[in-house]
């Protein structure tokens, strides 16, 4: 029996993104996400806006490709490490990855309530019902293992102070931490609107030019590297293998910025 889900604002965007992954997985196949397909199959929700929003779909798939690659590489280097997925929504990366010791999915109580119904988790996978800006570090049981923190699809809905607060929580909890943070260019924040996101009444509010600019705001972190989502786009739109080499296009695209605890 399918479930009817009602959300609004930023939490509603999680339905759009899991739908994009499910649709890609069952269609063209640039990613494979059977858990997303199962989740969408059990929902009553009008995805007509998401169906028409090609930009949103492409962006979700591109960042999934890049983040899966970076997460998998980190887990190979740190087997048994701890992963914290901040603002997890209905993300299913924990089902696509292996090699972690513990995986925490963190989001607002409203969101976690939905996740618990659709993706009940236990064992190595835990859920934390808190805001990303709350002091959630005390909910992490592991003491000395290296940690990977993923911040996907969130910073563009926050303020600079909010972003700094999240990194302060991370620095206060982990001595050894790598952060994968998705960011949006300020020009895009001001001028670009995704149809399905607008339909959920969520608004883009903050952006940062590049990894160096983000690191300058975070005294406890150093920049390791950054990746344009054009890298992910190139996996399913071949022309991006060329377009991604053009600085203006590479720089205007969302980025996955990799930072390390100092």
Q: Which sequence ranges carry the predicted segments?
A:
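Rossmann-like AdoMet
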Residues: 1-84, 88-130, 143
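A conserved beta-strand element that flanks and buttresses the S-adenosyl-L-methionine
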Residues: 149-150
